[in-house]
From Swiss-Prot:
<keyword id="KW-0964">Secreted</keyword>
<comment type="similarity">
    <text>Belongs to the tachykinin family.</text>
</comment>
<keyword id="KW-0027">Amidation</keyword>
<feature type="modified residue" description="Pyrrolidone carboxylic acid">
    <location>
        <position position="1"/>
    </location>
</feature>
<feature type="modified residue" description="Methionine amide">
    <location>
        <position position="10"/>
    </location>
</feature>
<protein>
    <recommendedName>
        <fullName>Tachykinin-like peptide-VI</fullName>
    </recommendedName>
</protein>
<dbReference type="GO" id="GO:0005576">
    <property type="term" value="C:extracellular region"/>
</dbReference>
<keyword id="KW-0873">Pyrrolidone carboxylic acid</keyword>
Length: 10
């Protein structure tokens, strides 16, 4: 899920 948040920043 943390990776998903990182993708959201993109």
């Amino acid at each position: 899920q943390k990776k998903d948040r990182f993708l959201g920043l993109m």
